[in-house]
Every structure is written in C-alpha cells, then in structure tokens.
Amino acid sequence: MMEDQQSLHSFISDYDQRSHAVEKYDGPDLSEVDSEDNDKMIKTNEDEAVKEPIYRTRSNQTEPDIANAPPYSRFDAKYKMALVLQCAYTGLFSTMAGAIYYPVLSVIEKQFHITEELVNITVVVYFIFQGIAPTLMGGLADSLGRRPVVLFAVTVYFGACIGLACAQTYAQIVVLRCLQAAGISPVIAINSGIIGDVTTRAERGGYVGYISGFQVLGSAFGALIGAGLSSRWGWRSIFWFLAIGSGVCLVFSIIMLPETKRTIVGNGSVTPRNYLNRAPLLMFPLIRRKLHLDDPEYETLEPRTQLSLLAPLSILKVKEISILLVTAGIQFATWSTHQTALSTVLSKNYHLSVAKIGLCYLPTGICTLISIVTSGRYLNWSYRRRFAKHKVWLKEQEEILVKENGYSREEVQNIINNDPKYVFNLVQTRLHAAFVTLLLSSSGFVAFGWCIDVKAPLASVLVMSGFASLFSNCILTFSTTLIVDIFPSKTSTATGCLNLFRCLLSALFIGCLSKMATSMTYGGVFTFLGALTALSACPLFYLLKNGREITLKRKRKEDASRAFALSVANEKAEAEGKAEESR
C-alpha cells in the first residue's frame, strides 16, 4: 500500500438522531476513513454529541454493516465506573506504599543505626524497581491479558508486606522493598491498559482522571496514615496495614476483576479460553446478559500481539513518546524529591513528631488529588470543544474549495484526503495546557526550597508544597491520556515505559538529594530542578507544532508494513494451497 494512498478523510456530515449511537473503532491506529462511513458518529453523553468517523482500512475487503455494528465496548457506564473503582483500589497500594513510608524515615534511621543516605536508599530502590517491573510486566499484560498479571502482582505485594512487617535487619528491608515495588507497580500501567480497552478517545480523559485521582489518594493520605499507625503501634504496623489491605484487594480481584484485553475478549462479549482470565463474577446471569457472553461478537476481537518483554525499548524510538518521557519524567522526579526532602526537613529543621509530619503531608496530597481529577475532566471538556470547532471549520473549508476554487465534490474530497492539515490535531488537544502547569509547578518548587533555606514559618513551606503539587501532576494525566491514544492496543507497554523513565529519574534525584543539599542547600537544589523542569518543557513546542504530521507519517509506515506482511502471508498461503492441490 503506497504512502500517498493512506491518509485520513474529513470529519464531515451530521449525526442522524434517529439512528443508534455507534462507538468509534478505537483499536490499533489506522490511517484511513471510508467516505461511506463519514456520517456515522458517536455520542459520548446525554447532553452533548461528539461526532467522529468510523475508522477502517482499505485492506478490509468486507463492507461492515455499520447500523448493526456491535458497540466498541459492552461495558456500560456503570460497569466502567465499577472497573475504575476496582483498578483504583488496586493501584492505591502502589501510591500508598511510597507515601506511607515517608514519615518513618527518621524512625528507620534511628532503629537500625544508619545514616540519612542509607535510609534514602530504601526509597531509591523502591523507585528503581517501581520503574523496571512495569516495563517487563506490561508486555505480559498486553499478550497474556490484564487479569492474570494483576493477580500475580497483588500476590507478590501481599507477601512482601508481610515480610517487611517481620524484617529484623536493614538488608532485609532493602530487599523486601525491592520485591514490594516490583510486585505492585505494574498495576498502574495495567490500569491504563484496562481503561484503554473499554473507553473511546472522547471519554478516555475523564476516566483516566478518575482512576488517577482515586489512586493518588494513597499519596494524599498515605503519609497521614503512616504517621498515625507508627506513632501508635510502631513502624511495623504500616506494613501490616498494607498486607491486610492488599489481601482484601486480592480477594476482590480474584472474584470480580474481568479480563478486558481486546485480543482475548473483544468488546467484552467473548468468553476467554484460559480459565485464569475468567472472573467468577461472569457466571451470574445478569452479567452474562449485559456483556452478551451467550452471543459473543467475535468480529470485535483484535489480532494477538507477540510476547516481547523488551517492547518498551522499541516504543522509545517513537518521537512523541520520547518527548513526553523526558518532560513528564523530570516533573514527577522533582515532585518525588520534594516529598522525600519534606520528611527530613520537618524532622530535623522543625523538630516535629512523626504524627505531625504526617499531618504536614496533607496539603501536598490533597492538592495532588485536585490536580489529577481536575486535569482529567478538563481533557474531556477540551476534546469535545475542540472537536466540535474542528468539524465546523472543516465544513467551511469544504465550501470554500467548492465555491471559490470551482472544485467538484470529488476533487475536494481528494484534496482533504491528502492534506494533513485537515486532520483533527489530537496532540494539541491533549497538550496545549501543559506549559502553564509546568511553569507554575516549577516556580512553586523553587519557592519551596528557598522557604526551607531561610527557615520561613512552617505554614509558608506547606503552602508552597501544596501550590507546586497542585500543578505538578497535570502533565502526567496529559501524557498518559495521549500515550493511550497513540498506542490503544499496547497501553500497558507504553505507560510502563513512561513509568520506567519517571521512576528511574526519581531514584537518581533522591539518591543525590542528601549530597546536593549539603553542597547547594535546598534552595539551590530546587532552583536547579525547577530550571530543569522548565527546560524539559521546550521540546513540547516542537511536538505541538509537528506532532500531527509525525503521528500520521508513522501510522502510514506501520500500515504499509502490515499490508506488506499480509500480502506475503497471502502469497505463502496461496502457494501452499497450490502445492497441496498438486499432490
């Protein structure tokens, strides 16, 4: 398939209110729209219709019956929200395991008679394995299914928490912290995969915001919970708390978590072959009827992907992803460094008790929660508004080409088909607000560092901490949503790649924090990190300007490769058939 034959058709025609709302195909990235399908739109909510085309490739030889096409997902809004709660509850233990540990850093330091650098190592190794594990497990989730990997991850985490509660030496804590991180961290990436499996682009931003918001409750209240438990029952109680919570989570996941991977269950109506992918909940007649399990829609199954544990390394070559990795990674690492520094400063500079240190993490956590939930809702609103404007503009351009230039409708269609400027700019829609949030958070972190240096009142330190956190995690929601849009069939792998980069950077920054603070002071450290964050935002200008063209070019190459592979496979099958006939 030649490159000049692969481009997007226009988003044209009005929604027929008498027809059923049809969900847009949101599977593997494709590069064509059939003109016959342009008048088939979707409706994302009861109040406002967002119109999108049905995507298909010319390689499809059979014309689909769009009017009777199965929905993109059989999971309705209530079931999707139930999935969000289930995934968020699981992911909560990943975010909480880090935050709940911060208030007891000084306690661990005294308990095992170690230095500040050594106690920070227990945080560093957690971030390292939190980054590496999803990179490997994300590929498994994209190949074997979401459910088996989640069950394995929670089981490992459950065992590691029990081990940490019983640890007797510093070495045991370091090793078990590695195991704890490796166990639970993949669920964050897998949660993105689950949401990508059951949602369309128009609604995805909101669901990503919801699940991120619920997950960040661990960061918001983890330190408070850890401080309360430690001050009453000692530092070991925080790991018993995590063990009990993750044990309950494991039971719920075994019973209720469905498989959503589209190569295994399609739109949710296909029963998985492997029993490990089947949730006992699906045995109930009401659930079976809702998901159409007795009348499976096999046409919604997507091609299986080959298992590759190193798949994230290939994703790193994608320009859009590499730019997002740098920007989001540095921002997250700065926020994590500030979280670690806050515990040390409150204990040594302000001489606060463990319980009061936990309370001082509330502004950070609550502002982070507000940041993530608000940014997700903003993405949904922005998508609907920009898409509606784009459709109106496209209609105007079509009329201009017809009336002012004298082109026929067929000629106009060919012009629109072959000009990238007529394609809806999804990259700009997701990232246009990133600069403001990055600059505001950077200024907040710089002010936070200098408040510590000048020994400002505690309220000033906490206000700056909350202000920086209010904007620092917006880029994570923007980046995660765009990555899911770009790689809808490899969401766990792609988000695992993002997680790897941001966690390794966090480990590097936290590992250097103590020595940097000694030589540069905290004001100098966070001025440096703030400048680094602002500098990392510069490549976003390039992405906003050229992202649409880069994405389209990559899609065309991928479609050409798939078409070539398909033709080779067809020729091989035809040759084998002739050889069989000759026998």
Swiss-Prot record:
Q: What happens when the gene is disrupted?
A: Leads to intracellular accumulation of clotrimazole.
The GO annotation for biological process reads: xenobiotic detoxification by transmembrane export across the plasma membrane
The region called Disordered is annotated at 23-46
Q: How does it sit in the membrane?
A: Multi-pass membrane protein
Q: What is its main location?
A: membrane
| Transmembrane annotation, as ranges | 88-108, 121-141, 148-168, 178-198, 208-228, 238-258, 323-342, 354-374, 432-452, 458-478, 493-513, 524-544
Matching InterPro entries, A to Z? MFS (IPR011701), MFS_dom (IPR020846), MFS_trans_sf (IPR036259), Sugar_transporter_CS (IPR005829)
Q: What does this protein do?
A: Multidrug resistance transporter involved in resistance to the antifungal drugs miconazole, tioconazole, clotrimazole, and ketoconazole; as well as to quinidine. Decreases the intracellular accumulation of clotrimazole in and plays a role in the extrusion of this antifungal from preloaded cells.
- Give the similarity note: Belongs to the major facilitator superfamily. CAR1 family.
Name the UniProt record assigns to this protein: Multidrug transporter QDR2
- Source taxonomy: Eukaryota, Fungi, Dikarya, Ascomycota, Saccharomycotina
